[in-house]
């Protein structure tokens, strides 16, 4: 009798363990399937950067500065389209999910570098912007107020607090990164970030929604070659840490730039020049944000 009880107990235990494994496996498959439906139908990468959506987004041409809406159902990016001879034009393209189908269409000619605000209500286009209307469409192009409407900005990003972080492109092909907070309901005069960030040529800032880190690209001493991607973390005293190079998995001797993070905080996107010095083939890559989190200082 005792042996039967022991055998029965072992059988129940094995059934329980197997059920747990099956449930865990199913959950993992469901999560993977859900993620693939979110990111333009792509399987998410690990710690090694991969071209994003080959053939759909990334081609043997020029694609740049992509970004998702908060619900991950719309992906906007810039594309260069060749015309007759050596002429070309730039377009703002969207890939959006409708009835579980991803469809690509041209939004407009390029009006600036797209950045979607954390709340999804505003699309910033460097010195311009569009607002999401009640019917879900984007408004007509509007100009930012002074002084932002006249600054030579390539990319403007904004935190959940509404703070602007943007670059200022200069005639000598150098650049600085500035910020502007909302004070008493108005944007303050733009201020330069510290000298550690504004060393060399610094462009294309991306501010975390909670302002806990700033990602940007810079060509400076100690890099891998051309422009590299760096991150600076905000310290407990409110100051910014010395910039950290994201390392050899992301940065190469080629030009890397225009980094951003998906609204869910899971993946880092960036650009890499895969062609010659003429930049005829610039691709969009993505990689797990864990590669960045590994650099975060331990408190």
Stretches found by the model and what they are:
Residues 3-11:
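Sec-dependent signal peptide recognition
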Residues 22-299:
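Short, conserved micro-motifs composed of acidic
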């Amino acid at each position: 009798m005792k042996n039967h009880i022991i055998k029965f107990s072992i059988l129940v235990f094995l059934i329980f363990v197997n059920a747990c494994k099956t449930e865990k496996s199913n959950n993992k498959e469901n999560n993977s399937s859900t993620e693939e439906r979110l990111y333009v139908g792509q399987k998410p990468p690990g710690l090694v950067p991969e071209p994003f959506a080959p053939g759909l987004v990334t081609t043997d041409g020029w694609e740049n500065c992509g970004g998702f809406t908060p619900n991950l159902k719309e992906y906007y990016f810039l594309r260069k389209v060749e015309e007759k001879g050596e002429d070309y034009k730039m377009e703002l393209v969207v890939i959006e999910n409708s009835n579980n189908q991803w469809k690509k269409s041209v939004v407009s000619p390029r009006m600036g570098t797209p950045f979607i605000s954390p709340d999804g209500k505003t699309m910033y286009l460097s010195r311009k912007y569009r607002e999401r209307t009640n019917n879900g469409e984007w408004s007509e192009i509007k100009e930012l107020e002074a002084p932002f409407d006249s600054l030579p900005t390539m990319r403007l990003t904004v935190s959940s607090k509404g703070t602007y972080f943007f670059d200022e492109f200069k005639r000598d092909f150098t650049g600085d990164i500035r910020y502007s907070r909302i004070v008493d309901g108005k944007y303050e005069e733009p201020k330069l970030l510290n000298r550690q960030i504004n060393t060399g040529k610094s462009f294309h800032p991306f501010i975390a929604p909670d302002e806990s880190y700033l990602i940007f690209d810079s060509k400076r001493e100690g890099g891998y070659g051309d422009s590299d991607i760096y991150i600076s973390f905000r310290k407990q005293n409110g100051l910014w840490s010395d910039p950290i190079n994201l390392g050899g998995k992301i940065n190469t001797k080629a030009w890397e730039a225009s980094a951003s993070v998906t609204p869910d905080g899971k993946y880092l996107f960036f650009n890499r020049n895969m062609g010659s010095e003429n930049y005829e083939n610039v691709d969009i890559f993505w990689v797990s944000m864990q590669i960045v989190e590994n650099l975060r200082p331990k408190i």
